[in-house]
Design a protein with these regions (language model features):
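A late C-terminal transmembrane helix in Major Facilitator Superfamily
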Residues: 315-345
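Helix-loop boundary and gating motifs at the non-cytosolic
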Residues: 2-51, 205, 209-230
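Helix-to-loop junctions at the C-terminal end of transmembrane segments
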Residues: 53-70, 246-261
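C-terminal transmembrane helical hairpin of 12-TM major facilitator-type secondary transporters
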Residues: 261-301
Length: 478
C-alpha cells in the first residue's frame, strides 16, 4: 500500500471519527440542559452549520493568500479544541448550542478540505485500474467507526473521551496541512476536459439521487431508533461494528472495474432498504431492520462520498464538489427528519405507497445518472486519447510511415486478425461510442467487445483506452 494511500486513510478516517464522535458528544452534553425534543432540534441546527462549513471551503481557499490560509488553519484548529471544552461545560442551552454551531462549522470546513485532498491523491490515476479511491474511503470509514467504538466503550471518563477527540483532530490537522502544502507546491490535478453541460447534469442528478436515498435511509434509521427509544429493543454499540464492515466491503466492491458496478450495487442495497421499511411498518422483525440498516448505511456512506470525489475531477470547482456528498447528506437528513417520522406514524398503506414511489423515482434517476456518467467518461477517454494521438504525429512524420503501415507492423507483432485490425483502425479514427462503432463496422456490440477483449489479451492491456494507449506507446518506442 502506498504512503499516500495510508495517509489518506488516516486523515479521512480520523475526520469521520471526530465528526461522528462530536455529534454523539454534543447530544450527550445537550441532554443536561434540555429535553429529548430540544436535543433533536439542536442536533439539526449543528448539522446545518456543518453544511455551511462544507460549502465555505472552496471560496475561502480561493480568496485567502497562502500565508493567511495557514494562519487560518492554525487558529481554527485551536478554536475546534476550545469548542469541545466549552460544550463539556454545558453552562446553558444557548452557550452550548453556540459552541456546537461554531464547532460543526469548522468541522465542515476541514471535512470538505479533507475530502478534496484525498481525492487529489488519486487524481492522476482515477481512470486506471490502479486507482483505489472507493477502497480508500471504505477503509477510512471503517477506521473512523472503529475509533468511535473504542472511544465510547473502552474509555469511561467523559473528559478522557474529549481529550482523545482533540488529540485525533490534532493528528488530522497535521496531515491536512502537510497534504495541502504539497498540493500547493505540485499544483492541482484537473480533468483533461473542461466541465461542460454533461458534467453539470451528472452532478445535479447525483445530488437528487443522494437526497432521495437520504430520505429512504433516514426513514429506516428512524424506524430502528423509535423501537430502541421506546424500550422495544436495546441497540447498544456492538452493531456499529457491522457498519464498519459494510463500509469496508462497499469500498472494495465499488472499485471493481473502475466503479462500473457501483450504481447497480447501490441500487440493490436501496431496494433491500425499501423492502425493509415496508416490513418494519407492517410489524415485521426488528432484528431484520437493524441488520439491514447498518449494512445499507455503510454502503450508502461510501457511495455518496466516493461518487462526489470522482465527480470533482470533471468540475472546475473541484474543491467544492469533492466534499459535497457529506454536505448534501447532512442537509437532507436535517430537512427530511420530521417528514420521515410523520411517514412512520402514518397508516401502513401510506408508508408503503410513498416508499415505493420514492424507490421508483430514484431508480429512474440512477438509470439516467449511469448513462450520463458513461457519456462523460467516454468524452474524458477521447480527450486523453486525442492528447496521445497528437504526441504520435511527429513520430509518423519522422519515420515517414503511414498509419496503414504502422497498423500492419502492430498486427504482425501481436498476431492480430484482419478483423481485429479493422476494429482497431475504427477505434483510432472514431470518437463515437461502442454502439455507433459497432454499426459502422456492421457487427454486434457483443462481437465488438469480443474483438477488443481478444486484442487486450494479446497486448496484455485492459479495456479500450488501455489498448489505444498501449498502441501509441508502442509507436513511440519504435
Amino acid at each position: 500500500m502506498r504512503k499516500g494511500t495510508v495517509r489518506s486513510i488516516l486523515m479521512l478516517g480520523i475526520f469521520y471519527f471526530v465528526f461522528l464522535g462530536a455529534e454523539y458528544y454534543f447530544d450527550n452534553m445537550m441532554a443536561f440542559v434540555t429535553d429529548a425534543d430540544g436535543v433533536v432540534l439542536a442536533q439539526s441546527y449543528v448539522l446545518g452549520s456543518s453544511v455551511l462549513g462544507f460549502l465555505l471551503y472552496a471560496p475561502m481557499e480561493k480568496m485567502l493568500p497562502a500565508k493567511i490560509k495557514r494562519l487560518f488553519w492554525s487558529v481554527s484548529s485551536v478554536a475546534v479544541i476550545l469548542m469541545f471544552f466549552f460544550i463539556k461545560i454545558h453552562s446553558g442551552y444557548g452557550h452550548t448550542l453556540r459552541a456546537g454551531l461554531f464547532l460543526f462549522l469548522l468541522l465542515g470546513y476541514f471535512g470538505s478540505g479533507v475530502h478534496y485532498l484525498v481525492a487529489q491523491t488519486f487524481a492522476a490515476e482515477i481512470e486506471t485500474e490502479k486507482s483505489h479511491l472507493a477502497r480508500t474511503v471504505g477503509c477510512a470509514y471503517a477506521f473512523g467507526i472503529l475509533l468511535q467504538f473504542i472511544n465510547n466503550n473502552c474509555i469511561s471518563s467523559v473528559a478522557a473521551q474529549v481529550i482523545f477527540l482533540c488529540l485525533a483532530f490534532a493528528v488530522m490537522e497535521g496531515l491536512f496541512m502537510v497534504k495541502a502544502q504539497q498540493i500547493e507546491t505540485q499544483g492541482e490535478t484537473h480533468s483533461v476536459i473542461e466541465a461542460d453541460g454533461a458534467a453539470r447534469k451528472t452532478g445535479m442528478l447525483l445530488i437528487f439521487i443522494v437526497a432521495l436515498m437520504t430520505f429512504i435511509f433516514a426513514t429506516l434509521d428512524n424506524a430502528v431508533t423509535l423501537i430502541h427509544a421506546g424500550g422495544g429493543a436495546d441497540i447498544g454499540q456492538w452493531p456499529r461494528l457491522l457498519l464498519a464492515c459494510s463500509g469496508l466491503l462497499a469500498g472494495f466492491l465499488y472499485d471493481i472495474k473502475k466503479g462500473a458496478y457501483q450504481n447497480i450495487i447501490m441500487y440493490c442495497v436501496m431496494m433491500l432498504s425499501t423492502i425493509c421499511v415496508v416490513v418494519i411498518t407492517c410489524g415485521g422483525p426488528f432484528l431484520l431492520g437493524l441488520v439491514v440498516f447498518y449494512l445499507s448505511a455503510g454502503f450508502f456512506s461510501i457511495y455518496f462520498a466516493s461518487s462526489f470525489m470522482r465527480l470533482s475531477y470533471a468540475m472546475k470547482e473541484g474543491k467544492l464538489w469533492a466534499g459535497l456528498g457529506r454536505a448534501v447528506n447532512n442537509l437532507c437528513a436535517v430537512g427530511t427528519a420530521s417528514m420521515s417520522l410523520t411517514l412512520l406514524h402514518s397508516p401502513s398503506y401510506v408508508t408503503i405507497v410513498i416508499a415505493l414511489v420514492l424507490f421508483a423515482i430514484t431508480s429512474v434517476l440512477i438509470f439516467v445518472y449511469q448513462r450520463a456518467g458513461d457519456q462523460m467518461r467516454w468524452k474524458q477517454e477521447n480527450a486523453i486519447l486525442s492528447q496521445e494521438a497528437q504526441k504520435t504525429e511527429k513520430i509518423l512524420e519522422t519515420h515517414k510511415k503511414n498509419e496503414e503501415e504502422w497498423l500492419a507492423l502492430f498486427a504482425q507483432e501481436f498476431s492480430l486478425t484482419p478483423r481485429e485490425v479493422e476494429v482497431l483502425s475504427c477505434m483510432l479514427h472514431s470518437e463515437d461510442n461502442v454502439t455507433e462503432m459497432a454499426t459502422q463496422l456492421a457487427i454486434s456490440r457483443a462481437a465488438l467487445y469480443r474483438h477488443i477483449s481478444n486484442m487486450n489479451e494479446k497486448t496484455n492491456t485492459k479495456a479500450r483506452i488501455g489498448l489505444l494507449q498501449f498502441y501509441y506507446a508502442w509507436m513511440q518506442e519504435k
